[in-house]
């Protein structure tokens, strides 16, 4: 995290985000080594249904995906521990030569690589430390490639970011490549809010860890005691709005940005959004950026979807 955090790009993104209304921190601050560990703990929480629903789909559909793709290279964007990816690795084993897990956390990626190299000795595990929004064009060639973005990570992108990302994916795909994406669907608000405000407070610790990372890397003075956790449904944008809210008026300094921020009581600090999708709207959005949905699978409850996509002919 330290090398990434001191980079000009993240400093500029942080400066820009803190100048918006509401103030925002780039999501990448969540994923230092501690944050990555906390996120993996979140994926095991009973309230956080997303990985279980996605697992149900991949367990059932991975053989079909493998039959259609015959992929030689599997790329996973934001790989984490690649838990659900194992269904794809198993199904693609007859043709797969290389797995490229991409993640911003070098330490976490190293651990994942060691485990997968032992589990899949016939597949070259070729880790890539980076940000999938910026580094898509730097990924290894050698198709057919299946590029996967699982866990509804696509929902963490703001609409303009998401459009740019989908456009970049369409541009990166060769004729025999495909894009596989996990998508959380709109559902009961109480279930959504519970998923991001669990009883054990793990998600709150995950979000607060972003402040700790900013304090460490940017010599900032965020005081955890002056903020309360806030995760709520935004009906207008159809996303979960996740972050913190100032309990009292105070000033925060970010020495490495040469910045001071005045928070009024109740001012929000957004750390993440998690958009929820409807099929028709998602297909229109992707189609406008050059991607066609070839298959759309949901879990039995209709909570979650996995879409297999290809680039539309120019």
Model segments located where?
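Conserved class I S-adenosyl-L-methionine
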Residues: 71-80
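Glycine-rich SAM-binding Motif I of class I
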Residues: 82-86
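A short, conserved alpha-helix within the catalytic core of class I
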Residues: 156-168
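Substrate-binding/catalytic lobe of Class I Rossmann-like enzymes that use SAM or dcSAM, i.e.
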Residues: 191-275, 279, 283-289
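Class I SAM-dependent methyltransferase Rossmann-like catalytic core
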Residues: 22-71
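N-terminal auxiliary segments of SAM/dcSAM-dependent transferases
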Residues: 1-29, 36
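Class I SAM-dependent methyltransferase SAM/SAH-binding core
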Residues: 89-134
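Conserved beta-strand signature within the Rossmann-like core of class I S-adenosyl-L-methionine
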Residues: 171-186
């Amino acid at each position: 995290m330290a090398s990434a955090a001191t980079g000009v790009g993240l400093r500029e993104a942080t400066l820009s985000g803190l100048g918006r209304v509401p103030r925002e921190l780039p999501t990448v601050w969540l994923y230092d080594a501690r944050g990555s560990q906390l996120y993996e703990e979140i994926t095991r929480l009973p309230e956080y249904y997303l990985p279980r629903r996605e697992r149900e789909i991949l367990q059932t559909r991975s053989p079909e995906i493998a039959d259609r793709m015959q992929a030689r290279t599997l790329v996973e964007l934001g790989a984490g521990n690649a838990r659900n990816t194992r269904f794809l690795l198993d199904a693609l084993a007859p043709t797969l030569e290389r797995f490229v897990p991409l993640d911003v956390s070098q330490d976490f990626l190293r651990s994942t690589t060691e485990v997968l190299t032992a589990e899949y000795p016939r597949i070259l595990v070729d880790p890539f430390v980076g940000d999938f929004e910026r580094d898509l064009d730097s990924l290894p060639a050698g198709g057919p490639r299946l590029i996967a973005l699982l866990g509804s990570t696509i929902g963490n992108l703001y609409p303009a970011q998401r459009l740019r990302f989908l456009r970049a994916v369409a541009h990166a795909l060769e004729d025999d490549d495909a894009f596989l994406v996990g998508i959380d669907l709109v559902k009961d608000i109480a279930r959504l809010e519970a998923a991001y405000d669990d009883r054990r407070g793990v998600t709150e610790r995950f979000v607060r860890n972003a402040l700790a990372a900013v304090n460490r890397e940017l010599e900032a003075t965020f005081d955890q005691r002056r903020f309360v956790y806030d995760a709520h449904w935004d009906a207008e944008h159809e996303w979960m709005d996740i972050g913190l809210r100032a309990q009292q008026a105070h000033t925060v300094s970010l020495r490495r940005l040469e910045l001071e921020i005045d928070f009024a009581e109740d001012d929000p600090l957004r750390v993440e959004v998690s958009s929820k999708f409807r099929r028709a709207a998602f297909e229109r959005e992707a189609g406008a950026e050059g991607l066609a949905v070839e298959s759309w699978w949901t879990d039995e409850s209709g909570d979650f979807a996995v879409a297999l996509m290809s680039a539309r002919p120019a």
